[in-house]
Amino acid sequence: MMQDPISDMLTRIRNAQAVRKKEVVMPRSKLKMSIANVLKEEGYIVDYREEGDLTKAQLVITLKYHEGESVISEIRRVSSPALQVYKSKDELPKVKNGLGIAIISTSKGVMSDRQARRLGEGGEVLCYVS
């Protein structure tokens, strides 16, 4: 059984980009779909989709490259099952002075730090992307 599916997702993306893969496939969950949606909205991936039936559902993420280089230079897990990191709306981090994003899980769903600030929401900091 997988201990931390979010870390697994981020590692799969990082490894796929290291070998310049076009797509990366992983087991699907609602949280992973929400994270993929934020990555797409912020322009870090081209697209994502679901494949398979309900028992073997897969999430397929199409990675984005610019002039042969990955658009994501760093993707790092912040909160983990052993140490969850929560920030209030006033404490939300700015990643790389606003050039990157933090993905936050709030009571209103998973969103970027910019959107959480706009809505006045705090929550669990899942990961940093730049």
UniProtKB/Swiss-Prot annotation:
GO terms for molecular function: rRNA binding; structural constituent of ribosome. GO terms for biological process: translation. Keywords: Ribonucleoprotein, Ribosomal protein, RNA-binding, rRNA-binding. InterPro entries: Ribosomal_uS8 (IPR000630), Ribosomal_uS8_CS (IPR047863), Ribosomal_uS8_sf (IPR035987). It comes from the Bacteria. Part of the 30S ribosomal subunit. Contacts proteins S5 and S12. PANTHER family: 40S RIBOSOMAL PROTEIN S15A. This is Small ribosomal subunit protein uS8. It comes from Coxiella burnetii (strain RSA 331 / Henzerling II).
